[in-house]
């Protein structure tokens, strides 16, 4: 497994070196990766919890993202969590039109969100009941937000606000950006990362990010803390880009 990850990381580095410089500016649709595959290990309060496999595919002006989370050990009993996001690729980045979340075989736990950009209206469906919210420009979903950072002007600095729907509610995450890069070693690869730390205004659920500066700002590490203090840490172990 270690050698497999190391080879993929090496191939990925060669591929990126041919098409992008480390100091990339705003990405255009012409330089957008056609396919990104990422695998993560997740711990809960420091203990093994799950594995995540994600696939981002962009074809001309549309994209599709699939994310599958499988629990390990006793957590496997919860079944797979599947996230799907589809939408358009614009000069400003990803513009979701539909998001779905399915947890195991329990249909009652499914969530969805429809983005009506013309009417600036977000329609979330929870347990079959629609719930509406104002749709602000740049709003993302649980699957798409991780692939939106590549469209932002580089280098990122100062602060950033991420508007994100979970399918159940619409959250705003405010971050302060640490301009000094942090190195993260994971699964035989070393990543230069940009650290997005929650601002002091975030008092409940937080999501902290370390983005790969040289690899389209793909998240290398994500630290999530819910309003009960439970910690989920997601770390990149495999990455491949076409």
Summary of predicted features, one role per range:
Residues 1, 20-21, 145:
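Intrinsic low-complexity/disordered segments
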Residues 1-9:
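Bacterial N-terminal signal peptides that target proteins for export
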Residues 9-10, 20:
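Cleavable N-terminal signal peptides
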Residues 11-13, 89:
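Extended hydrophobic/Leu-rich segments
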Residues 15-19:
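N-terminal signal peptide c-region/cleavage motif recognized by signal peptidases
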Residues 23-117, 154-242:
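Acidic, serine/threonine-rich low-complexity disordered tracts
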Residues 106-150:
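Hydrophobic, well-structured mid-protein blocks that either form specific transmembrane helices
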């Amino acid at each position: 497994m270690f050698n497999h990850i190391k080879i993929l990381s090496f191939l990925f580095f060669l591929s990126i070196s041919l098409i992008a410089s480390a100091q990339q500016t705003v990405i255009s649709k012409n330089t957008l990766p056609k396919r990104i595959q990422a695998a993560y290990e997740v711990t809960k309060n420091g203990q093994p919890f799950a594995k995540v496999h994600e696939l981002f595919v962009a074809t001309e002006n549309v994209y599709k993202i699939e994310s599958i989370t499988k629990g390990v050990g006793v957590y496997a009993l919860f079944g797979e969590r599947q996230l799907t996001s589809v939408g358009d690729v614009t000069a400003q980045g990803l513009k979701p039109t539909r998001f779905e979340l399915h947890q195991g075989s329990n249909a009652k736990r499914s969530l969805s969100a429809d983005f009506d950009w013309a009417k600036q209206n977000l329609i979330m469906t929870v347990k079959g009941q629609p719930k509406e919210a104002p749709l602000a420009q740049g709003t993302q979903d649980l699957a798409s937000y991780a692939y939106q950072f590549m469209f932002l002007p580089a280098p990122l600095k100062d602060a950033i606000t991420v508007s994100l729907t979970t399918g159940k509610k619409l959250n705003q995450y405010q971050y302060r950006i640490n301009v000094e890069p942090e190195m993260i070693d994971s699964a035989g690869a070393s990543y230069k990362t940009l650290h997005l730390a929650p601002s002091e205004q975030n008092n409940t659920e937080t999501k902290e990010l370390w983005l790969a500066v040289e690899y389209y700002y793909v998240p290398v590490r994500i630290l999530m803390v819910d309003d009960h203090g439970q910690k989920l840490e997601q770390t990149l172990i495999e990455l491949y880009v076409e």
